[in-house]
Amino acid sequence: MRHCISVLGAGSWGTALALLIARNGVPTLLWSHRREHAEAMAAERRNAHYLPHATFPDTLSVTPDLAEAAATASDAVLVAVPSHAFRATLDLCAPHLQPEAGLMWATKGLDRTRGCLLHETAREILGPDRALAVLSGPTFAAEVVAELPSAITVGASSEAFGAKIVSWLHNAYFRAYTTDDLIGAQLGGACKNVLAIAAGISDGLGFGANARAALITRGLAEMMRLSLALGARTETLMGLAGVGDLVLTATDNQSRNRRFGLGVGKGRPREEIHAEIGQEIEGILAARLIHELAGRKGVDMPITAQTYRVLYEGLPPEEAVRNLLLRDPKPEWDR
C-alpha cells in the first residue's frame, strides 16, 4: 500500500508527528525498529509506551519493515530517530526511496561519525538532488498530540518542498513557518539541548532564576556565534528554531535534557537519572560534538565547553560555574 509520508522512528516525537500528519488526512506510515513495538501499536492503535492516550486515526498505519516504509512513501520520508542513529537509518533506507520522495528530519543533533550537520550527511548518502528539510522549534510531543497551540520552523532546500511540508503539518492548532536557512534551523535544535543541560545543572545547584536567565541569554549568544560562523542567518536563531526552542527546553521540566541537568546539579548518579528519564538525552552527545565543532571553527562557546567538561571530564558542576564567573569582563556583544 502506498502512503504519502513515512515517519521513521516511533518514539514520542516521531509518533506525535505521525499523528499530526495523519490527523490532517494524509496517509501516513509509522516505522518502529522493534517488531514487538510495531505489532503492539498496530493491534492497540496507540503507542502505549510513549503517548498512551492518543488513538491512531485510520490514516495512520504501522510497520516494523524499514524497506517497506521507505519504498511506499510517495511524497516524503520523515526521520525522527536519535542523532546517533541518523546515518545508519539513512544508509539502510536509501536504496528503497522513491526517486521523487523528499527527506525531512526532526532529529536534533549532529552526525556522530563525522561531527557534521545532518543535511551534509543526507547529501553524502542521497546525492545532491534530493529535496531536504529539517523540522525544528519549541514543541513537546505531548502538547502537540493534545492539540495545544504550537509552532515550528521548516528549513527546506526549496520553496516548493517547504510549502508541501506546511500543507501536511498546518492546522488550527499547529503552525509551520518556512526558511531556506537549514544551517541555522539545525544548529538551534542541536545547541539548545546542551544549554538546557547547563540550565538544569544551575537549577539543580540551587542558583536561582537570575542565573538561569543569564545562562539562556549568554547561551544564545554562543549559539549565534557558531551558527553565523557556519553560514546561518541571525533571524533564524532569533526565531522558533533558536531562541524559541532554547527557552522551552531550558525552562520546562518536560525537557529530558533539562531534567538530566537537574539531576547532575543535585549530585545524583548518572545511571539513575538515565533510568528515570527512560529516553534519549540528545544533549549529552551534542555537548561533545558541538564542543569539538566549535574548536575546529575557532568559535568561543564557554557554556558549552564547561558543560562538556562536567559530562566528559568529571569537572564538579560548582567548579564549572566558578570558571564561567571568573572569565575576564568583556562587552556583551562582539563587534
From Swiss-Prot:
GO CC entries: cytosol
Catalytic activity reads:
sn-glycerol 3-phosphate + NAD(+) = dihydroxyacetone phosphate + NADH + H(+); sn-glycerol 3-phosphate + NADP(+) = dihydroxyacetone phosphate + NADPH + H(+)
List of catalytic residues: 192
Record GO biological process: carbohydrate metabolic process; glycerol-3-phosphate biosynthetic process; glycerol-3-phosphate catabolic process; glycerophospholipid biosynthetic process
Q: Where do the annotations place sn-glycerol 3-phosphate binding?
A: 108, 137, 139, 192, 245, 255-257
Q: Which compartments is it annotated to reside in?
A: Cytoplasm
UniProt entry tagged with the keyword Cytoplasm: yes
Check the UniProt entry and state the signal peptide residues, or none: none
Q: Does the keyword Oxidoreductase apply?
A: yes
What keywords are annotated for this sequence in UniProt? Cytoplasm, Lipid biosynthesis, Lipid metabolism, NAD, NADP, Nucleotide-binding, Oxidoreductase, Phospholipid biosynthesis, Phospholipid metabolism
Which is a Pfam family this sequence falls into?
A: NAD_Gly3P_dh_N
Report the EC number(s), separated by commas if there are several: 1.1.1.94
* Ligand binding (NADPH): 12-13, 33-34, 108, 141, 256, 282
Show the GO MF annotations.
Answer: glycerol-3-phosphate dehydrogenase [NAD(P)+] activity; NAD binding
Q: In which pathway does it act?
A: Membrane lipid metabolism; glycerophospholipid metabolism
Q: What does this protein do?
A: Catalyzes the reduction of the glycolytic intermediate dihydroxyacetone phosphate (DHAP) to sn-glycerol 3-phosphate (G3P), the key precursor for phospholipid synthesis.
Q: Which family does it belong to?
A: Belongs to the NAD-dependent glycerol-3-phosphate dehydrogenase family.
From the Swiss-Prot or TrEMBL record, give the protein name.
Glycerol-3-phosphate dehydrogenase [NAD(P)+]
Q: Which organism is it from?
A: Methylococcus capsulatus (strain ATCC 33009 / NCIMB 11132 / Bath)
Q: Gene encoding this chain?
A: gpsA
